[in-house]
Amino acid sequence: EAISGKFKALYCEGEDIAQSDPNTQHVTHALESMECVIVQDLFLNETAMYAHVFLPGSSFLEKNGTFTNAERRISPVRKVMQPKNGYEDWEITAMLSNALGYPMNYKHASEIMDEVASLTPTFKGVSFKKLDELGSIQWPCNDESPEGTPTMHIDEFVRGKGKFFITEYVPTT
């Protein structure tokens, strides 16, 4: 939809979509179509080459937050040194948001996690405190599974029977 002009801008934080997406030509064409691309990262990666604005990122050693991997495991990240750029990633995002007129007046990354937990049913029971106590949690983490859910869909899928989609085979050239 970026190519068609429906999306005008993109804010990409800590992800190299021009390199990591399976269809890089489609992604780079979409990036070229944007009126404004803002990239926040540690490195001038492939996506940054399309950026109109580049903001400095923080390493995992310089910020508080979480990482969630492909097995749904939410792991805590705790700052061990001050960010060399002066700010954690979430602080830069909040400052940009405030400057654009959408208030994000957080004082700590834990407040963001609390908001995510209040708005996302599968994260309802997640907090910095619980992550620090347990080490990591696999979502969903809620009233039914207060310490997370290591295995999903044991008896059935959440939405009933599994859904399969037929896709067209496209041979490589």
Model-derived features: where do they sit?
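Long, low-complexity segments enriched in small/aliphatic residues
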Residues: 113-173
